Amino acid sequence: MTGTAEFDSFADSYDRDLAEALAASGEDRRYFAEGRVKWLGGILQRMGMKPRRVMDYGCGTGSTSTLLLEKLEAEAVVGVDLSLRSLDVARKNNSSDRIQFSPIEKYTASGSVDLAYCNGVFHHIPPAKRSEALRFIHRSLRAGGLFSFWENNPWNPGARHVMAHCAFDRDAVTLSPPEAKRLVRSEGFTVLRTDFLFIFPRFLRLARPAEKLISKLPLGAQYQILCEKTD
């Protein structure tokens, strides 16, 4: 991730800034967060996997950490981030003793995590430092652990619009799905599947049930690469 100071400056306005950027979609951030976690949960259920310990990498203010705990029925969630101010906000907003928040530099990556989740973080990490971030995630996972890697799809005009109008995304460097797959494979992950979500904005919401049928097409505003730690 980028420097601590950058996201410290957005910690208190993060929700408002994101809401303004997402306004064109007709939905709020919770809609997208719940959609990602629900999609992931369905896949895990079909795989027969119930992760006990989950990492929320780049957790920010912690809103998704709560969803991961509740929707995936995890025993514990640890959210890690560079921004100390964002972590302070996360602690204030999350009272469960099953969720902990830690600065990345103070977290020991010990191979105890069953599932690592990361959304919209890597486009903030300078390309030269992305491998280092992936190695941290790899070390954090147990053998056979899964990595749910979500990113904004630069091929989707809606995603580009949101990023162009989001205060903390304007200097982001996006990753195409092929770039992201090459990156995770280079750091010892095996790609299990790639899915594209959030194709239809709210005014076309009646078409949303069809998204499951076309989730392999690179149309959605976000994509997930689900990977396994295999070496």
Model regions: which residues?
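Short alpha-helix
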Residues: 173-188, 194
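Short, glycine-/aromatic-enriched active-site segment of Class I SAM-dependent methyltransferases
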Residues: 153-170
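Conserved beta-strand signature within the Rossmann-like core of class I S-adenosyl-L-methionine
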Residues: 144-151
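Class I SAM-dependent methyltransferase SAM/SAH-binding core
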Residues: 63-106
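Conserved alpha-helix/loop element of class I SAM-dependent methyltransferases that forms part
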Residues: 31-50
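A conserved beta-strand element that flanks and buttresses the S-adenosyl-L-methionine
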Residues: 117
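N-terminal, positively charged/glycine-rich alpha-helical extensions of SAM-dependent methyltransferases
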Residues: 1-21
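A short glycine-rich, Lys/Arg-flanked "PGG" loop and its adjoining helix->strand segment in the class I
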Residues: 131-143
